[in-house]
Design a protein with these regions (language model features):
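Feature primarily recognizes SF3-like P-loop helicase cores of small DNA viruses
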Residues: 1-80, 84-343
């Protein structure tokens, strides 16, 4: 036992004056971890830069450092190995309820729900290092404000049942895993900057499935923790987490697919510097398009703000508000009807 100085990667004797009240489930020890390597290989597929990135991410999650402001999202089909990875790390760091560093939270904390209790759950983040949540339902939407709050590094306010609110400095890192990526109700650069999408491709077939893997991984926990510490050192001395091309491309693709306003502009609007369209007509067209496509309909005020964020200006003439630089496309003319009596 003892204390790991994460700045040096060394195990030193614990001192009472440090007032450490949490501990991992195992003591780190160098050694191979082939089973865990096989779990990670499903992600990095032998790409050394992606492999090193994953270890830096896991190493950073040992710390309470909040400078990176990252939300990790592991996604892929069911039976792809995501749960095995997350549960192994959580087991190594120990359950926060029992004096460890890992804590599970409800995904409803970060997605829109009818009975919104996300802010009530913030207190569950206090003191944790590795926070994880499982996303299981398709069609959910990110609660952008709370996601940015949870990974923004700012002081948080939480409240326990029957207690007064209390403030605390965050120490956690947020990992979410699931089969479906939540939707974004609006293009959000804050989410894009923080989001790291890690894809688990393929599925584990019945022939590949090993029901003993989770138990056999336990023997590798000390070595895995040792490698996480090495990843933490790499993060500190290599200039930060970095974001491999695969991760950045996945985020760009995701954001493009969630950009409903951009899709409407491409499909329904001509961009002509000398033209303008009334704000009311533009919004009614967008609303009809969004409803027809099952998309989220933002308010007219938010619609105008999002257009301004994309560089479109507004003007007013004769009591009518206009959006400059756009013109609604004319609807396609219906095909001519053919009356056999006209022959």
């Amino acid at each position: 036992g003892g204390t790991v100085d994460l700045r040096l990667g060394k195990l030193v004797e614990a001192e009472r004056e440090q007032y450490i009240t949490r501990q991992t489930s195992v003591t780190p020890a160098p050694g191979p971890h082939p089973l865990f390597d096989s779990v990670l290989e499903r992600i990095h597929a032998g790409k050394e830069d992606l492999k090193a990135y994953l270890w830096r991410c896991l190493g950073l999650s040992l710390t309470g450092d909040q400078r990176e402001e990252i939300l990790w999202f592991l996604y892929g089909k069911a039976q792809s190995g995501k749960t095995t990875l997350i549960e192994a790390i959580a087991a190594i760091l120990g359950d926060a309820k029992s004096g460890g560093y890992a804590t599970a939270v409800d995904m409803e904390m970060f997605t829109e729900t009818k009975n919104d209790r996300g802010n009530d759950r913030i207190i569950h983040l206090q003191g944790a290092r590795f926070v994880y949540a499982s996303e299981t339902e398709e069609g959910r939407s990110w609660k952008s404000s709370l996601v940015k709050l949870a990974v923004g590094g700012d002081t948080l306010v939480g409240k326990r049942l029957y207690c007064d609110p209390e403030t605390f400095r965050p120490t956690h890192h947020l990992w979410i895993f699931g089969n479906h990526r939540p939707h974004l109700k609006q293009s959000d650069d804050g989410i894009k900057r923080r989001l790291h999408l890690i894809e688990y491709p393929g599925v584990i077939t019945d022939e590949e499935r090993d029901n003993t893997l989770k138990d056999r991984l336990k023997a590798e926990y000390p070595a895995i923790l040792h490698s996480m510490i090495q990843g933490c050192l790499d993060w500190q001395y290599s200039g930060g987490i970095g974001r491999p091309e695969e991760i950045g491309d996945a985020v760009d693709e995701y954001m493009a697919g969630e950009d409903e306003l951009g899709a409407w502009l491409d499909e329904k609007v001509e961009r002509l510097p000398a033209m303008r369209e009334s704000s009311g007509d533009a919004y009614r067209n967008f609303r009809a398009w969004a409803e027809a496509n099952g998309s989220f309909v933002v308010s007219q005020k938010r619609f105008s703000v999002q257009l301004e964020e994309r560089g479109f200006t507004r003007s007013r003439s004769g009591g009518v508000r206009y959006i400059n630089g756009i013109k609604l496309k004319m609807p396609d003319a219906p095909p001519p009807s053919y009356d056999y009596n006209d022959r």
